[in-house]
């Protein structure tokens, strides 16, 4: 049996896409990198394509090849990493559109794949990926056939951060007067308003129900099966390191999931799981394949518990672990059975 069942609410996913799409005046591309933020790129991209999405972004050419096999020849698939050495056959055969990040990538792409579509990523202040402003004047007038000019905001999850306005100004300074379509906003930038929208928005985490899209519908439910329930007496310790000691008689359920499945050790003795409306605290350490949960308050012995679902979002679980919803989502492991609800 799988370590758990990860259910994707396709209706919620599509609703989030359409809500974000209505905010932008131009096109909306779905970001499905990291295996669709951990949910299964094939599942989510197929659902989004049926809902009208025709442009997608992935991190690497290898991800793009897999997506092309699922979606067929029609959609545009863009690659954030650009045209890396060794990627040429993948980009050519899967008809991917790399976002070129440096003069070296521009030279490589135009030399080995002349006439093949490409976009340009510009570094407007994040100092991570993109053509640097000092290198742009020498390239600007040579790249009129680019499909897109894009950049990425470093602080879009904090709308009032001055870095956002600075990057917007830099992006405009680098691209104003060029007829090529432009894109600056992912989920956070989309929510900051029309100044950041340009011709294409690129929502990622907001599609999947994560912050900063506070109005998103929850997309993910993760139910974990109970292997065994035992009664422990006062003074008994639970799990590795004996970090939890029962002070009264407790019913402890052992569940089939652990840090190998993306439930990181930082959740140890901090997370809550749910049996219907009944909260059940995780006790002791998260181990590789197992969790131990106090189910004393459950009316009947549960067969499964929810760690993500109606009572707990990805960001609430992330808060318990001291991390962000992105990490929780993208860590969800391959041992879960993936399922869709319409």
From Swiss-Prot:
Pfam families: Ala_racemase_C, Ala_racemase_N. Keywords: Isomerase, Pyridoxal phosphate. The keyword Isomerase applies. Its cofactor is pyridoxal 5'-phosphate. Gene3D superfamilies: Alanine racemase, Lyase, Ornithine Decarboxylase, Chain A, domain 1. GO terms for cellular component: cytosol. The modification N6-(pyridoxal phosphate)lysine is found at residue 33. InterPro entries: Ala_racemase, Ala_racemase/Decarboxylase_C, Ala_racemase_C, Ala_racemase_N, Ala_racemase_pyridoxalP-BS, PLP-binding_barrel. Pathway: Amino-acid biosynthesis; D-alanine biosynthesis; D-alanine from L-alanine: step 1/1. SMART domains: Ala_racemase_C. It catalyses: L-alanine = D-alanine. The active site is at 33 (proton acceptor), 240 (proton acceptor). Substrate binds at residues 128, 288. Its EC number is 5.1.1.1. One of its GO terms (biological process) is D-alanine biosynthetic process. Coiled coil: none annotated. GO terms for molecular function: alanine racemase activity; pyridoxal phosphate binding. Catalyzes the interconversion of L-alanine and D-alanine. May also act on other amino acids. Belongs to the alanine racemase family. NCBIfam families: alr. This is Alanine racemase. It comes from Jannaschia sp. (strain CCS1).
